[in-house]
Amino acid sequence: MTLQIGVIGCGAIGQDHIRRLTRTLSGARVVAVTDIDPTQAHAAVANHGLNAEVYANGGDLIEAPDVQAVLVTSWGPTHEEFVLKAIAQGKPVFCEKPLAVTADGCMRIVAAEQAHGSRLVQVGFMRPYDAGYRALKQVIDSGTIGAPLMLHCAHRNPSVGDRYMTDMAITDTLIHELDVLRWLTGDDYVSAQVVYPRKTRHASSHLADPQIVLLETAQGVRIDVEIFVNCQYGYDIQCEVVGENGIATLPDPQAVSLKHAARHAIAILTDWKDRFIAAYDIELQAFIDGVQGGALTGPSAWDGYAAAVAADACVRAQKSGAIERIEMAARPAFYRG
């Protein structure tokens, strides 16, 4: 069976997903697209040689009889509306982060999905599908290094545009760590604090960069995450887990070690899409396979809610300078196991 997918949002990430659905992945095809800018939607059809209907809006696309599943890659504040409409239609939906722009919005999606009675939502957190992170989790879960005590992490980008604001270090950048570190440790966060080192001269006047986020989990694991979005030298993701009996470190992407002209060097990636390109492929293939098999297993609406609650606390901590509590609702049995 070929899963017929409708794509809402034909910007950069939307077209990237259309490309992989069309050229890389198996078991699905794009039959419908829409974008707030109709020219973008028509360009996606032309650029990727799609035999797809262009719809005026996301609501009409979701209701289309030939659309069996929905991919939401539109502007963040529209995500909640489209995910809720897909659930109301009983259609599986893959939603890029954020699931909703507020924790309350995420909880409305959680409630709607539970009322439906089975999982329909997968959130676009791709790092749990990255080979390096999966290997790191395997080491942690095996008990080789003992119980995790501390995590030292970094999320570095070469540069960001002038529209990137201080709170986006949390909502656009740290959000990936908030999801994957919770997945790695199997533990929820209970507090967050943000501290500001000396500001880099490469940051815009309105942006505090770098930042350090300090997290604590329910089991007492301490996590520090450096966010440095104007580091200049490349796109660099680091994660070191300190356990009772040893240390496990996220491997860097494979690269050729070059000795030339009296230098020994290894190239560093500069584009986040290249760093996680395989993970993007695997997560979307997992969604296709899950829909066809009748059971989604990827990041859930509850995971989206958990990330949103933690992000809200981190943004409060940015402003207050204090340690902010992270308080989540009780996890429903629907999302356990």
Swiss-Prot record:
<dbReference type="InterPro" id="IPR004104">
    <property type="entry name" value="Gfo/Idh/MocA-like_OxRdtase_C"/>
</dbReference>
<dbReference type="InterPro" id="IPR023794">
    <property type="entry name" value="MI/DCI_dehydrogenase"/>
</dbReference>
<dbReference type="GO" id="GO:0000166">
    <property type="term" value="F:nucleotide binding"/>
</dbReference>
<comment type="similarity">
    <text>Belongs to the Gfo/Idh/MocA family.</text>
</comment>
<comment type="subunit">
    <text>Homotetramer.</text>
</comment>
<dbReference type="GO" id="GO:0050112">
    <property type="term" value="F:inositol 2-dehydrogenase (NAD+) activity"/>
</dbReference>
<comment type="function">
    <text>Involved in the oxidation of myo-inositol (MI) to 2-keto-myo-inositol (2KMI or 2-inosose).</text>
</comment>
<dbReference type="InterPro" id="IPR000683">
    <property type="entry name" value="Gfo/Idh/MocA-like_OxRdtase_N"/>
</dbReference>
<dbReference type="InterPro" id="IPR050424">
    <property type="entry name" value="Gfo-Idh-MocA_inositol_DH"/>
</dbReference>
<dbReference type="Pfam" id="PF02894">
    <property type="entry name" value="GFO_IDH_MocA_C"/>
</dbReference>
<protein>
    <recommendedName>
        <fullName>Inositol 2-dehydrogenase</fullName>
        <ecNumber>1.1.1.18</ecNumber>
    </recommendedName>
</protein>
<dbReference type="InterPro" id="IPR036291">
    <property type="entry name" value="NAD(P)-bd_dom_sf"/>
</dbReference>
<dbReference type="Pfam" id="PF01408">
    <property type="entry name" value="GFO_IDH_MocA"/>
</dbReference>
<keyword id="KW-0560">Oxidoreductase</keyword>
<dbReference type="GO" id="GO:0019310">
    <property type="term" value="P:inositol catabolic process"/>
</dbReference>
<keyword id="KW-0520">NAD</keyword>
